[in-house]
């Protein structure tokens, strides 16, 4: 499920900003004023690896601004890197959104997976008001999820970190002040069998978003672990994006949990 986009459908941004720890690449839709999707890859995954998923979103009629992030965000065992990464990416996203607006784009959504989901969780509301709808492809507690990655946990232990210290260091990122989210629409994609970011871990984070005015739902997918949960969400990305984009129509209530398990049978 890989391949390349044709000439003229993409524009590359090759320069990696060392202090920011990310790289971006733009994939153009056929129409200049098509909605734009901010797409952030999972931890340790490159844009080229997920070109197949990006291509599916482009074919559905969206510009895609894709990002990949440095593995140092976890492997360097320095919690400040995540904070700096989020700050740097916010600034870049604001710049890219401003540029796209000047080119005629008026709608902006997002699709973030795993670490990418958490970064975007810290970019909604007052942080970047233009992001009013989008998909969190897995979600939960960033410190607990990272601690479940054996290699990353060992690296942090070597540097004197414990889970409680990490939770304290990232508390303000885990519980951001959104401001008002009136009219915003978001969905979390998850699986009961995801051992890194389990479905049941999402519930505590729905309340603050709803209290801020957002419509938030949880979509359960059929998977056997964290990676397959991510892939299931990526495979269904065009349909899931349509669920949250205003004016696309949603057939079920937004207050509860939905399941895509039967619909995705036979796929990752």
Go through each PLM region and give its residues.
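Cap/lid segment of the alpha/beta-hydrolase catalytic domain
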Residues: 40-88
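Hydrolase active-site cap/lid region
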Residues: 121-165
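Alpha/beta-hydrolase active-site loop
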Residues: 79-103
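C-terminal catalytic histidine-bearing segment of alpha/beta-hydrolase fold enzymes
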Residues: 210-268
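N-terminal cap/lid segment of alpha/beta-hydrolase-fold proteins
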Residues: 1-31
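Gly/Ala-rich beta-loop-alpha elbow adjacent to hydrolase catalytic centers
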Residues: 111-120
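The feature captures the conserved acid-bearing segment of alpha/beta-hydrolase catalytic domains
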Residues: 146-207
